[in-house]
């Protein structure tokens, strides 16, 4: 993907990425590179409209809805309806769908034996204390943080996280993290490349090799997906 102005290397703003498809079948194929990818996951933005049946996904996936409405049904007749800011997990399988200008980000997980249920994630699930940043990196007083994990199997996990304001020095990322901000804003920066700010509603991916400091000036909440190489 072409680098956008003022975006750090290996930091991708998925909300401004070109749409990879207007129907779910095309989007699944594009995101998973037709099932031939050796990458741990695929990702992309799609703007879906219309409906379809018999759509196969070879991989488990996470769908995050930025705008519009999306209804998905599995072969057992279970149904999910997503609206703005909602997230669903899907196992590999066959699906029917109906969408109205559904602007979404899809992540497919190229990992065998991963147990993923079909359902909408409860992003308001109670959180427990945890997920604090490394104290040695802080440039402000330590924040108060909390988290909840929906999936914690190595090498991929996802959940929700909240923090009070804090800032830290740049780190070089050795893992991938996709973030969907639900509240607040954050600025990622480094001295050589500048800075980029993301706000509530943005979905972005930080890939291995990115160098970024973190600064959230107000309370922040996010949905996150992390892949840590073995």
List each model region and its residues.
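Ligand-binding loop in jelly-roll beta-barrel domains
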Residues: 92-115, 208-230
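Short hydrophobic/aromatic-rich beta-strand segments that constitute the beta-sheet cores
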Residues: 71-72, 90, 106-108, 170-171, ...
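Short, conserved beta-strand element in jelly-roll/cupin
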Residues: 57-71, 172-188
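A short, N-terminal "cap"/entry segment at the start of jelly-roll beta-barrel domains
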Residues: 1-45, 50, 102, 109-155, ...
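Conserved hydrophobic/aromatic beta-strand scaffold that supports enzyme active sites
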Residues: 43-45, 62, 87-89, 158-160, ...
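Short acidic-glycine-tyrosine-enriched beta hairpin
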Residues: 76-93, 192-209
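Short histidine-centered beta-strand/loop micro-motifs
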Residues: 51-58, 74, 99, 159-160, ...
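Intrinsically disordered, low-complexity segments enriched in Gly and acidic/Ser/Thr residues
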Residues: 149-166, 170-178, 183, 190, ...
């Amino acid at each position: 993907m072409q680098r956008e102005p003022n975006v750090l290397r290996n930091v991708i703003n998925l909300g401004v990425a070109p749409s990879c498809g207007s129907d779910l079948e095309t989007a699944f194929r594009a995101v998973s590179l037709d099932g031939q990818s050796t990458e741990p996951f695929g990702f992309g933005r799609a703007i879906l409209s219309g409906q379809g049946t018999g759509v196969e996904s070879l991989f488990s996936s996470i769908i995050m809805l930025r705008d519009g409405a999306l209804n998905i049904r599995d072969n057992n007749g279970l149904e999910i309806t997503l609206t703005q800011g909602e997230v669903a997990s899907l196992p590999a399988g066959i699906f029917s769908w109906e969408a109205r200008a559904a602007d979404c980000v899809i992540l497919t997980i190229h990992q065998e034996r991963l147990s993923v249920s079909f359902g909408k994630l409860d992003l308001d699930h109670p959180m427990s204390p945890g997920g604090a940043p490394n104290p040695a990196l802080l440039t402000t007083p330590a924040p108060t943080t909390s988290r909840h994990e929906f999936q914690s199997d190595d090498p991929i996990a996802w959940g929700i996280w909240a923090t009070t304001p804090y800032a830290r020095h740049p780190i070089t990322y050795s893992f991938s993290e996709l973030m969907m901000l639900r509240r607040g804003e954050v600025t990622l920066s480094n001295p050589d490349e500048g800075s980029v700010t993301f706000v509530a509603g943005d979905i972005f991916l930080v890939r291995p090799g990115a160098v970024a400091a973190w600064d959230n000036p107000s309370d922040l909440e996010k949905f996150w997906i992390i892949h840590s190489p073995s």
